[in-house]
């Protein structure tokens, strides 16, 4: 009890000292006056004054309110059944540790540890790149923190006219995330933090994440003024989930780039949990976090590019085998095969093993394999299958978390030769 008492005294002294210090600081008092005015008025001009400062967003007014759209499509997986014990165990697992494992970026401690870096990067975006910060209210009630950076005029191919919406991974933030890659190339970019990440409120359950993604898309069109066909969706890792869902609901987008993205989160979850808990994991995923990207991206028929990491350590399910076996277990491979089956089923029939063969080839061998001198029907079909693989997937020799080299970010084009 004595230790607890002294700890309480120290906490009171620390917070009391901070309060006194802030009230004596002229700049802080000026910020407080602006914050109170903005909170009371809700006017856009007051919000803009408030954005000169970096602070906890609790209590601020949103710059944009998303409109509920009843026509949006949602993936409805198979109905899962289970005993009361299984249901209860799965619910406990999801809320006790499952969500934290799936989305570590939403953990308070993780956010606190990165807060200094995020503030510095955010301020740099505004001061050095003329970033435009906006707070969006989703239909689920969450406040989503976003940053828009317009590309400079005079870029090749008028890239500034194309908006890249970046969808970060499970520990990614727009301040230090994938938006930097297309920004370096001159594209306009719109980054956003998922619910519970950085200054965004809420938690990243599927409904909240998709509502946030739709709010970002609505904002991009109605406020920033980009047409649907001028928007590229760029998802990294688990960010492929909201990116694919947006593509399914906004099919006229210019293209979709999925970097280090899996087909379905279930095999990855089961590979990292004890086999004795397999049933609990399956129920928990299907009932609470059914991130079945392969089923979602099937709704989209437009330009698509997958980027596979050759040194992938997160999306593999075989950690004990050789390098060849580990690479073969990369779930990006399964996503490619599913896309080929969906878009070009006539090419894959009886040749699915050839996709695995192509995935295992080095670049030089792929180039030779794609130009067979054999005119047989099977050889021609195999050659066209290899061409499809090459069109949809690019290899990047890097680990899962290494930033994507700008040279590998290419907006995909439609593939007309394989109808």
Annotate each PLM feature.
Residues 266-377:
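The feature captures the conserved acid-bearing segment of alpha/beta-hydrolase catalytic domains
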Residues 347-419:
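Catalytic active-site module of serine/aspartate enzymes centered on a nucleophile-bearing elbow/loop
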Residues 1-122, 411, 415-419:
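N-terminal targeting or regulatory segments adjacent to alpha/beta-hydrolase or S9 domains
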Residues 27, 117, 121-123, 131, ...:
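Short, surface-exposed "cap/lid" segments of acyl-processing enzymes
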Residues 203-225:
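Alpha/beta-hydrolase active-site loop
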Residues 176, 196-208, 267:
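Glycine-rich "HGGG/HGxG" loop immediately N-terminal to the catalytic nucleophile
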Residues 223, 229-272:
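Primarily recognizes the serine-hydrolase "nucleophile elbow" in alpha/beta-hydrolase
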Residues 193-198, 262:
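Short beta-to-alpha linker loops that shape the active-site pocket of alpha/beta-hydrolase fold enzymes
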């Amino acid at each position: 009890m004595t230790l607890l008492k002294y700890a309480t005294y120290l906490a009171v002294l620390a917070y009391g000292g901070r309060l006194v210090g802030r009230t004596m600081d002229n700049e802080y008092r000026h910020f407080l006056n602006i914050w109170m005015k903005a909170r009371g008025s809700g006017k856009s001009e007051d919000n803009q004054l408030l954005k000169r400062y970096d602070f906890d967003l609790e209590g601020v007014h949103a710059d944009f309110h998303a409109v509920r759209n009843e026509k949006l499509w949602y993936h409805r997986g198979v109905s899962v059944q289970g005993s009361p014990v299984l249901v209860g165990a799965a619910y406990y697992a999801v809320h006790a540790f499952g969500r934290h494992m799936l989305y570590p970026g939403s953990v308070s401690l993780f956010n606190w540890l990165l807060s200094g870096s995020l503030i510095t990067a955010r301020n740099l975006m505004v001061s050095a790149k003329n970033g435009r910060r906006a707070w969006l209210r989703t239909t689920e009630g969450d406040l989503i923190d976003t940053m828009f950076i317009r590309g400079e005029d005079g870029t090749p191919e008028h890239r500034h006219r194309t908006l890249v919406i970046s969808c970060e991974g499970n520990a990614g933030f727009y301040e230090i995330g994938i938006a930097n890659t297309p920004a370096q190339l001159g594209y306009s970019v719109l980054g956003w933090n998922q619910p519970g990440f950085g200054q965004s409120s809420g938690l990243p359950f599927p409904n909240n994440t998709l509502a946030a993604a739709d709010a970002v898309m609505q904002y991009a069109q109605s406020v920033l003024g980009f047409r649907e066909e001028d928007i590229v969706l760029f998802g990294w890792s688990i960010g492929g989930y909201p990116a694919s869902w947006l593509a399914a609901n906004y099919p006229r987008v210019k293209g979709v780039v999925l970097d280090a993205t899996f087909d379905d989160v279930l095999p990855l979850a089961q590979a990292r949990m004890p086999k004795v808990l397999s049933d609990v994991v399956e129920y928990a995923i299907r009932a609470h976090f059914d991130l079945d990207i392969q089923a979602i991206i099937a709704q989209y028929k437009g330009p698509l590019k997958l980027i596979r990491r050759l040194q992938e350590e997160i999306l593999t399910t075989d950690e004990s085998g050789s390098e060849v076996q580990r690479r073969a277990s990369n779930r990006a491979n399964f996503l490619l095969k599913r896309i080929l089956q969906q878009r070009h089923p006539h090419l894959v029939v009886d040749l699915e093993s050839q996709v695995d063969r192509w995935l295992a080839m080095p670049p030089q061998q792929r180039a030779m394999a794609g130009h067979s001198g054999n005119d047989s029907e099977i050889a021609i079909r195999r050659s066209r299958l290899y061409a499809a693989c090459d069109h949809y997937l690019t290899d990047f020799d890097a680990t899962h978390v290494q930033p994507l080299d700008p040279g590998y970010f290419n907006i995909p084009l439609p593939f007309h030769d394989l109808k």
